[in-house]
Amino acid sequence: MAAAAADKSTKERLLSTLDDLEVLSRELIEMLALSRSQKLPPPGEDTLILELLIQRDKEFQELMQTALEQGRVHQEMQSLEKEVEKRDSDIQQLQKQLKEAEHILATAVYQAKEKLKSIDKARKGSISSKEIIKYAHRISASNAVCAPLNWVPGDPRRPYPTDLEMRSGMLGNMSNMSTNGVNGHLPGDALAAGRLPDVLTPQYPWQSTDVSMGILPPHHGNDFGLEPPGHNKENEDDVEAMSTDSSSSSSDSD
């Protein structure tokens, strides 16, 4: 009997005790009703019913205390469940942040490895600055940085004046202009014909004819002259320096 009662829940035990109390109370009320109608019940029956009623009431009070205790435990369990849910949410948030940090760290590690590979590759194929400077000098000695407008790739001519072209050009002949003209003036017949003197005539195709046309105005007289520079010695030195640089570049390229 005790084992069967232990298997029942507190709610079932409370309901069973309430049913017993209800039955005993009804019997006790019926006995009181019979005593008023002068129909006495068997002797000792009322005492037995009262004892059972008191016993069931005691059991009911004990069950009520158990139920209250279980209610407090249930409330604690609910509060603990809420706390667990909160902690679980915090753990999930931390897990998400850890996943993001892991992704960032993995990306950083991958980029660092790639940089290390690039550094190792650069170290294996490194070139000293001296070699780069020598190569730049070799390029500058064999190639020009600019060319006349009529020069195209594949042209056998060099895109810059050589030593011979510098000496036979306008700058090289400026020192001889005073000897070819009268008192430093250009020859009158050349000016009258609307052309430059032979000393100023372009000797090579890369020399633009627009330069010569820009020097002579459309209307000129026989007395128009181009005054030579005041210091022929300085001009000769400049031409000599330019010729020396050009010849050195030509020799390097050859």
From Swiss-Prot:
Pfam families documented for this protein: Med4
Protein localization: Nucleus
Coiled-coil regions listed in the entry: 72-114
Major location (coarse): nucleus
Record region (Disordered): 215-254
GO cellular component labels: core mediator complex; mediator complex
InterPro entries (alphabetical): Mediator_Med4
Single GO molecular function: transcription coregulator activity
GO biological process: regulation of transcription by RNA polymerase II
Role, per record: Component of the Mediator complex, a coactivator involved in the regulated transcription of nearly all RNA polymerase II-dependent genes. Mediator functions as a bridge to convey information from gene-specific regulatory proteins to the basal RNA polymerase II transcription machinery. Mediator is recruited to promoters by direct interactions with regulatory proteins and serves as a scaffold for the assembly of a functional preinitiation complex with RNA polymerase II and the general transcription factors.
Family: Belongs to the Mediator complex subunit 4 family.
Subunit structure: Component of the Mediator complex.
Name under which the protein is recorded: Mediator of RNA polymerase II transcription subunit 4
Organism encoding this protein: Danio rerio
